[in-house]
């Protein structure tokens, strides 16, 4: 039941080091990585043989898979008892069949997932920004810096596929990820590196 909360609890470690979270805002539209995503990610990587891509095994790929399949959980679901229970009843049987019949992994009980979601709701509540569109409008005439991790060669569409991440870390991803319209982004700055580096999505060295 505690699986899937590890990264969330790192917040406490960061707080102990003096990191201030008062400006942290989480969109209610953000997808939630569930513990079964982490298990599926680890299993897939371990059984990929020569096709192994060096994933971080944090469940990111499977989370995107469920998002695209429209069977994922979003932050906003945590704060609607009816919506959350409906989603659990719809999604969990699908995931359990997959866990058992495809991956040979243990199934999750309904109570386990509901309890986990309740813990997520409590942990995230101080940071969820339900009026995020108003927040964007408030700063529309100001200069805002969007900083993206990773880079072009890890883009799921334009990178060194399949040795890529699951999203679009290119400039256009700033608009999709933030809710800002593409026309509102006036300048894109790319940072290049002539050295070899190890990508977050692959164990191989890539040259950029």
Regions found by a protein language model. Give the residues of each.
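A structural-propensity feature for long, helix-poor, extended segments
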Residues: 3, 180-199
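Glycine-rich phosphate-binding loop plus the immediately following alpha-helix
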Residues: 81-85, 170-185
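Hydrophobic alpha-helical scaffolding
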Residues: 3, 77, 106, 160-164, ...
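Acidic, glycine-rich active-site loops and adjacent beta-strand->loop/helix elements
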Residues: 30-32, 151, 191-195
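Single conserved hydrophobic/aromatic residue that forms the stacking wall/gate
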Residues: 1-9, 197-208
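Conserved phosphate/anionic-ligand binding catalytic regions in large, soluble enzymes, centered on
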Residues: 54-69, 143-178, 196-199
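Internal alpha/beta core interface subdomains
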Residues: 14-134, 144
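Short, well-ordered loop/turn and helix-capping segments at boundaries between secondary-structure elements
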Residues: 13-16, 176, 180, 194
């Amino acid at each position: 039941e505690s699986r899937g909360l590890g990264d969330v609890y790192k917040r406490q470690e960061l707080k102990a080091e003096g990191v201030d979270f008062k400006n942290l805002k989480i969109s209610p539209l953000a997808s939630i990585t569930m513990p079964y995503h982490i298990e599926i990610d680890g299993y897939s990587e371990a059984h990929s043989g020569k096709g192994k891509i060096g994933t971080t095994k944090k469940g990111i790929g499977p989370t995107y898979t469920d998002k695209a399949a429209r069977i994922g959980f979003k932050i906003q679901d945590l704060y609607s008892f009816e919506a959350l229970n409906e989603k659990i009843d719809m999604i969990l049987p699908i995931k359990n069949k997959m866990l058992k019949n495809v991956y040979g992994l243990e199934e999750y009980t309904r109570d386990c997932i509901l309890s986990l979601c309740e813990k997520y709701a409590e942990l995230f509540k101080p940071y969820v920004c339900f009026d995020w569109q108003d927040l964007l409008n408030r700063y529309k005439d100001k200069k805002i810096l969007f900083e993206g991790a990773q880079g072009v060669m890890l883009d799921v569409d334009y990178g060194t596929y399949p040795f890529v991440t699951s999203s679009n870390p290119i400039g256009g991803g700033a608009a999709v990820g933030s809710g800002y319209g593409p026309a509102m982004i006036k300048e894109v700055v790319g940072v290049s590196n002539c050295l070899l580096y190890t990508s977050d999505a692959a164990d191989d060295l890539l040259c950029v």
